[in-house]
Structures are given as C-alpha cells and as structure tokens.
C-alpha cells in the first residue's frame, strides 16, 4: 500500500484512537467520539488505521521512496577463448556489483549498454568510446525515470559511464537534487588514463577522449584495488615487475573482485574522505591484497609450488612497492623499458630457493645456472636501430592530442 502523503492518510478519518495508534497525533476535542454501537464505523476506522500503519511501516518518518540501485557492468566477455581465459566476468553476478556499499533492500536494475571493447569483444563490436556514449544515454534516461534515492554502481568500463554522467549532470539545471543520487565506482580506468594522458586527449586505439575530472554535486564512493592497473596504476611505470603485477591484477586477479568487497572489513587507515567546493564527498576505499597478483599468477599458470608463494611474495613485494612511492614519476623512454628487462633475472634466485626446498637441490642448481645464463645474455642486450621501426609502429597507436 502506498499513501500519497501523511496528511492525505490522516485527513480521511479524524478520531483520537486512529491518530494515537497510526499517526501519533494529538486528539482534537472538536471531533466527537464514535458511538459504541456503530459497527460499520468501527470497521471503517479499523481498516483505515491498518492502512496507515502499513504506510508508517513502509515510509518510516515522513515521506520517502524506496531506494533503487542502477548498475552499470563492465566489459562484456570476449568471444575469443584465449582472451576470455584472461578476463571473464559472469553476467549473473552483475546485480551484486557494489551491493555492500548501498542499502541492501534497494531494488536493483542493470542498465543495458554494449559494454564492448573493440577488437577484444569482437571485430564487429563498438569501440569503448561508442559503448560509453550509449551507456551514458541509457543511464541518464534511467536516472530521470526513477524516483530517488538512487545508488548508481559501476564496474570497470561501467565507471567510465558514471564519470561521463556525473559530468553531464554537473552542468544540467534540471539534474536531480544532490541528496537523491550517490555514485559508486569500482575499478575506474580513468585513474589510469588521468595518470597517462592529459584531459582532452583522444586515445585512438579505444576511440575514447580522456575527460577532465568533474566537480560533481553528488556524493561518490571509489573502490580501489591495490595494484590494479586500472584504478591503482604504478607511479613509476619503468618498474617492469610492478607493470607485470599490475597487469595480473587488472586482467584476472583483483580488478573485478573489488566490486564485491565489504567496506566493513576495510581498515580505517585505508578509507579517505574529501569534500569538494559543492559540498559533495568522495570516499575512497583502498582494498589491500594479501598476496601479489603476480605471485598468484605464478602459482596458477607457471607451476610455482603454493608453499613457495610466501617466500616469493616477500622477495618481490619491496621491489614492486617502490613503483608506488609518492612523488613525481620520472619520464619513461621506451628504450629504457626494454633495457629494464635485464633486471628480471634478479628475481630468479629468490624463486630458486623455495623451489629447491620443495623439489630438491638439483632444481635449485638448475635454476641458478639458468639465471646466470640469462643474466649473461641480457647483459649484452641493447636497443639499437633495429628497434626503431617497431617503436614507430607503437607510436602510431598513441594519442595524437585533442580531438575536436
């Protein structure tokens, strides 16, 4: 049952007993009591009182509407087997995105849009730019056709839709009031794009123009997964181990999982809140990982014994964490990245020790010998003129500046 308003409910019948039970209002002496023998009137009063109690239970104090959650999922699964094995998200989990960060009784609706990433999602699929544009229009229509309060939750590419919608509403005088909307973003790729490119830069390979951060009038929740290349990219991309670890986190371990995290389990030191000039808050939850994504990948895909994972993690984590140290990131030359491969064999001794302890000393000896050979081979490696052509091809995919 739905009452158009508390005043509409209580104005129907004026009787002290009804007021006292259903609305808690004071008795009015001007209203005469019911006659004891008036059975029909008693039934009428009882029915209205029951209806008003239902209104009170549904609406609580004052007038309110049921909460709604609009959910914008991430990129759709790839039709290609090898790519699907690297990134796969079960569509059945879409309604659960961000569910721990809003009212659990909210009615959930998944906003339909392509969720495509040409060519990963198919040679005939739309580009990221086209997909985000369609998603923004669909989300905007859903917001305007839904009574508040509304929680808008997005994952990965879905957060690009949320970012664009917030920017649109920031300049729209007909936008819903600030208290009606809350945006929840898990694994926002714009964190990576803002780190790599200036706002207004068009990235041809994904047909996407990097937006400027919007000064939104709505409260926002950001969910950031530690080491996730999309939401927590390395500050120093010249650290190749950190790059590999971030790719592992973004592709398979950790990126999507942040959408299902529980804010109650996040340590206070990993929760930050800022307030912008419009009075809206942005609360960031930093979801830490107990094991490096790269180490998990080594266990799952490279045969690293699980009992060796802790030792390898302890050896690699300090090296990887150096890429996240605060301060301006140094300029990176593509040649420096290639030459940085020389440092990778240095991790082999750390891996060789636990492997040897679990599979025999001969394995450790063989690994050490292979490490020495690889180190000697890479010591003489150099990026010469032969690499210029390849680097030129890569530059062709890089941003060309603003797109008008």
UniProtKB/Swiss-Prot annotation:
Protein name: SL1278 acyltransferase Chp1
Function text: Involved in the final steps of the cell wall sulfolipid-1 (SL-1) biosynthesis. Catalyzes two successive acylations of the precursor 2-palmitoyl-3-(C43)-phthioceranyl-alpha, alpha'-D-trehalose-2'-sulfate (SL1278) to yield the tetraacylated sulfolipid SL-1.
Keywords assigned: Acyltransferase, Cell inner membrane, Cell membrane, Lipid biosynthesis, Lipid metabolism, Membrane, Transferase, Transmembrane, Transmembrane helix
MF terms in GO: acyltransferase activity
Membrane topology reported for the UniProt record: Single-pass membrane protein
Side of membrane Periplasmic, spans: 1-42
Enzyme type, top EC level: transferase
GO BP of this protein: lipid metabolic process
Catalytic activity, reaction form: 3 3'-(hydroxy)phthioceranyl-2'-palmitoyl(stearoyl)-2-O-sulfo-alpha,alpha-trehalose = 3,6,6'-tris-(hydroxy)phthioceranyl-2-palmitoyl(stearoyl)-2'-sulfo-alpha-alpha-trehalose + 2 2'-palmitoyl/stearoyl-2-O-sulfo-alpha,alpha-trehalose
Subcellular location(s) per record: Cell inner membrane
Enzyme Commission no: 2.3.1.284
Cellular component terms (Gene Ontology): plasma membrane
Pfam families per record: PE-PPE
Impact after mutating residue 156 to A: Lack of activity
Family: Belongs to the mycobacterial PPE family.
Sequence ranges on the Cytoplasmic membrane side: 64-404
């Amino acid at each position: 049952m739905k009452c158009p308003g508390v005043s509409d409910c209580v104005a129907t019948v004026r009787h002290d007993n009804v007021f006292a039970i259903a609305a808690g209002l004071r008795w009015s002496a001007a209203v005469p009591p019911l006659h004891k023998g008036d059975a029909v009137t008693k039934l009428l009063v009882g029915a209205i009182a029951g209806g008003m109690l239902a209104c009170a239970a549904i609406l609580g104090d004052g007038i309110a509407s049921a909460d709604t959650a609009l959910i914008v999922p991430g990129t759709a699964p790839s039709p290609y087997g090898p790519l699907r094995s690297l990134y796969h998200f079960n569509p059945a989990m879409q309604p659960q995105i961000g569910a721990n960060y809003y009212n659990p009784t909210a009615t959930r609706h998944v906003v339909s849009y392509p969720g495509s990433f040409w060519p990963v999602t198919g040679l005939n699929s739309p580009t990221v730019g086209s997909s985000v544009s369609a998603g923004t229009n669909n989300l905007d229509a859903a917001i305007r056709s839904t009574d508040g309060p509304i929680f808008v939750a997005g994952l990965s590419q879905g957060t690009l839709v949320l970012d664009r919608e917030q920017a649109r509403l920031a300049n729209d005088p007909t936008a819903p009031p600030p208290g009606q909307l809350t945006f929840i973003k898990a694994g926002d790729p714009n964190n990576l794009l803002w780190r790599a490119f200036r706002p207004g830069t068009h990235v041809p390979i994904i047909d996407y123009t990097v937006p400027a951060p919007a000064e939104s009038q709505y409260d926002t929740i950001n969910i950031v997964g530690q080491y996730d290349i999309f939401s927590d990219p390395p500050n120093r991309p010249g650290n190749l181990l950190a790059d590999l670890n971030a790719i592992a986190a973004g592709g398979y371990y950790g990126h999507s999982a942040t959408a299902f995290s529980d804010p109650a389990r996040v340590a206070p030191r990993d929760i930050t809140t800022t307030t912008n000039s419009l009075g809206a808050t942005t609360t960031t939850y930093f979801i830490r990982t107990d094991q490096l994504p790269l180490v998990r990948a080594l266990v799952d895909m490279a045969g690293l014994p699980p009992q060796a994972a802790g030792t390898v993690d302890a050896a690699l984590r300090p090296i990887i964490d150096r890429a996240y140290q605060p301060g301006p990131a140094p300029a990176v030359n593509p040649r420096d990245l290639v030459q940085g491969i020389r440092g990778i064999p240095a991790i082999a001794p750390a891996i060789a020790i636990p492997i040897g302890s679990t599979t025999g000393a001969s394995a450790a000896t063989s690994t050490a010998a292979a490490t020495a050979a690889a180190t000697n081979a890479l010591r003489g490696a150099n990026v010469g003129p032969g690499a210029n052509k390849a680097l030129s091809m890569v530059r062709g995919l890089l941003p060309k500046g603003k797109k008008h």
